[in-house]
């Protein structure tokens, strides 16, 4: 065997050996992997602001009182999917998932006005704004494409996709919201409705505790990169 041939053979063997090794970085960060933000035991990584509180009971996040906000402190999220699995204590209860919060909140109203609240409320109070307050809508800004939210103690799965300025909300495998920054939104009528304006592509996320009469349980909060 010539030295040139021997060199080629040894190089091929080395490449095959490398390919046979486990790719730890790939196996730990697959694009289709969901990364849990709630460990099922405590609220490590989360911080509460505003009235009320959130506790962990039987492996679930439970809302108490309000209106307050439990947000993930470690990082902002963009170009990802956010999965939230939740249920209501009663036939209908009010909560929400906040996205695109520009800075760490110090009180609960800043995320309402300068982020987006993805609503959890199957039967909003009777008003002209009802269409804009249904589960899966961007609160006060978008009408629902469908109303697939399940009542009472039934589990719901909400998946929020953040793709640059594009936001898509799917509830129980049914699309409810498909919104891109800059699309028309209804005029603001009440002080509690969000301020109009563009939101950042990346932001903090949080869970709302709405009031003493609105108890919601969260079983899973997870993120998945888009790219």
Residue ranges and their predicted role:
Residues 21-227:
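Carbohydrate-interacting regions of secretory-pathway proteins
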Residues 1-11:
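Bacterial N-terminal signal peptides that target proteins for export
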Residues 10-20:
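Bacterial N-terminal signal peptides
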């Amino acid at each position: 065997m010539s030295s040139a041939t021997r060199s080629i053979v040894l190089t091929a063997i080395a490449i095959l050996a490398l390919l046979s090794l486990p790719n730890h970085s790939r196996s730990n960060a697959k694009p289709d992997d969901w990364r849990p933000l709630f460990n099922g035991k405590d609220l490590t990584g989360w911080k509460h602001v505003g009235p009320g509180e959130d506790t962990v009971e039987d492996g679930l996040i439970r809302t108490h009182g309000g209106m307050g906000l439990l947000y993930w402190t470690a990082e902002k999220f963009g170009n990802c999917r956010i999965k939230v699995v939740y249920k209501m204590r009663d036939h209908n209860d009010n909560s929400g998932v906040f996205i695109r919060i520009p800075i760490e909140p110090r009180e609960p109203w800043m995320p309402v006005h300068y982020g987006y609240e993805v609503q959890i409320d199957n039967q909003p109070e009777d008003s002209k704004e009802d269409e804009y307050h249904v589960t899966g809508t961007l609160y006060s800004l978008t009408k629902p494409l469908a109303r697939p939210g399940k009542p009472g103690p039934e589990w719901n799965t909400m998946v929020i996709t953040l793709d640059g300025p594009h936001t898509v909300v799917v509830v129980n495998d049914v699309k409810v919201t498909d919104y891109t920054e800059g699309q028309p939104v209804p005029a603001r009528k009440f002080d509690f409705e969000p301020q109009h304006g563009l939101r950042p592509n990346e932001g903090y996320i949080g869970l709302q505790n709405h009031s003493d009469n609105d108890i919601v349980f969260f079983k899973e909060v997870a993120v998945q990169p888009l790219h």
